[in-house]
């Protein structure tokens, strides 16, 4: 019964996530970009890679965020058809960050599976 409850909860979370990203594909992207700008104000170069269908809307928002945050470096925004809608890659000279929903979902599935397996091995119902 517990396994089924966990499966239902994960399925609901996936569905909700998909619906939210479909409704607001730039929501998480602009949040992540804003966080990067707050920590990388003096970075000389920042590259944001996004889905090509979101390019125009994202470009305007990201450029506005750069100005508001005081970012003075070179900002490059690239449209990439291989990046899923709602995902992005942000890169700078010393690092970067990736928002990739498929990888997040895979990690969640792995962790839930491990948790349930450990409960089964411990003899819990």
Question: What are the residue ranges of the model-derived segments?
Answer:
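Elongated, mostly alpha-helical coiled-coil "stalk/stator" tethers of large membrane protein machines
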Residues: 1-125
